[in-house]
């Protein structure tokens, strides 16, 4: 795989050493299958999470362009917005966050606790909107207004999910391949599939590094029919920028996100409690809980290609546990 193409893109180092890849012995015994976990929840900044991998590339590009302000968007409890704001604070940049309330709740914990509380600690400028119906256009409109105030804004898309941001998960695939070498022969990888950048970056990287490994994206906000074109579009854009081919099919399961994005469900919450009680690992109600519910049910329903070891990508999100109390 011509990874030298990745060096063409400016990159800041926020993460340092590879995140741990760990065996989960008690969960493995419980499920009757070898389960491993990639701990992107323990990245170093602001309670961790996967978006730092994307921000290493995106914020480097922002600084190259001379930006002094990062603008992004997401839900009130967005992990991506929290990590973007933290990076901005670390680098002395201004951060403007365009937020929506996707579940229409008036619950005080959701509106003020968890990730939203952390945004205030990072001195984030908050702009509320009724809904992110066209986030790219809404972010551009906001950037124009911020620029008129004398700032030099750089727009980071929802979830950091552009071809540039997703380079972080092409690199993650290399990290996984190196960590698994001569240790475990993975059969499948499971990841939450939302804004699609993490999923697409892994798809490109794993196709070239571990082509026999099955990659399953568990959707957290959309049906397969809605999500698959988003993942494929990013997959092809990433491959194009790296001068690679990307022919691997995109596998998605959409049975686990109902009743909708950001709304906890019973299977997801059971998965959160199971990982906490068996392994001391904290999942969240929005992304990783639902993705783990998919992994658990996938084993039960024999949905995986074979009975080999499974790697779960832990993308973070634990701050949302506090926002979703008393569901937790």
Curated annotation (Swiss-Prot):
List its EC numbers: 4.4.1.15
Query: Which Gene3D superfamilies is this protein grouped with?
Result: 3.40.50.1100
Tell me, which GO biological process terms does this entry list? D-amino acid metabolic process
Reactions the enzyme catalyzes:
D-cysteine + H2O = hydrogen sulfide + pyruvate + NH4(+) + H(+)
Q: Write down the required cofactor(s).
A: pyridoxal 5'-phosphate
Coiled-coil portions: none
Keyword Disulfide bond in annotation: no
Role, per record = Catalyzes the alpha,beta-elimination reaction of D-cysteine and of several D-cysteine derivatives. It could be a defense mechanism against D-cysteine.
Q: What is the protein's name according to its record? A: D-cysteine desulfhydrase
Instruction: Name the source organism.
Output: Salmonella typhimurium (strain LT2 / SGSC1412 / ATCC 700720)
């Amino acid at each position: 795989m011509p990874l030298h193409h990745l060096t063409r893109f400016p990159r800041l180092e926020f993460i340092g050493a590879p995140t741990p890849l760990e065996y989960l012995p008690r969960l493995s015994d419980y499920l009757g299958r070898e389960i491993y976990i990639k701990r992107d929840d323990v990245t170093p900044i602001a309670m961790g999470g996967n978006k730092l991998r994307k921000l290493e590339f995106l914020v480097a590009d922002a600084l190259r362009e001379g930006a002094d302000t990062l603008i992004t968007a997401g839900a009130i409890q967005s992990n991506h917005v929290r990590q973007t704001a933290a990076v901005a604070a670390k680098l002395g940049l201004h951060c403007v966050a365009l937020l929506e309330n996707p579940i229409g709740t008036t619950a005080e914990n959701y509106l003020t606790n968890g990730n939203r509380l952390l945004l205030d600690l990072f001195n984030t400028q908050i702009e509320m909107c009724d809904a992110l119906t066209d986030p790219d256009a809404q972010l551009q409109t906001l950037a124009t207004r911020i620029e008129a105030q004398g700032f030099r804004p750089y727009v980071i898309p929802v979830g950091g999910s552009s071809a540039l941001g997703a380079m972080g998960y092409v690199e993650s695939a290399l990290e996984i391949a190196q960590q698994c070498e001569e240790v475990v022969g993975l059969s499948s990888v499971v990841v939450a599939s939302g804004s699609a950048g993490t999923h697409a970056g892994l798809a490109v990287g794993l196709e070239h590094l571990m082509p026999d490994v099955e990659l399953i994206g568990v959707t957290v906000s959309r049906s397969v029919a809605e999500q698959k074109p988003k993942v494929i579009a990013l997959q092809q854009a990433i491959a194009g920028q790296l001068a690679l081919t990307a022919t691997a099919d995109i596998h998605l399961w959409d049975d686990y996100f109902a009743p909708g994005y950001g709304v906890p469900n019973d299977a997801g919450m059971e998965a959160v409690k199971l990982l906490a009680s068996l392994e001391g690992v904290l999942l969240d109600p929005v992304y990783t809980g639902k993705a783990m519910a998919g992994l658990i049910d996938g084993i039960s329903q024999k949905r995986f290609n074979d009975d080999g070891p499974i790697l779960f990508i832990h993308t973070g999100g634990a701050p949302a546990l506090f926002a979703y109390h008393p569901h937790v």
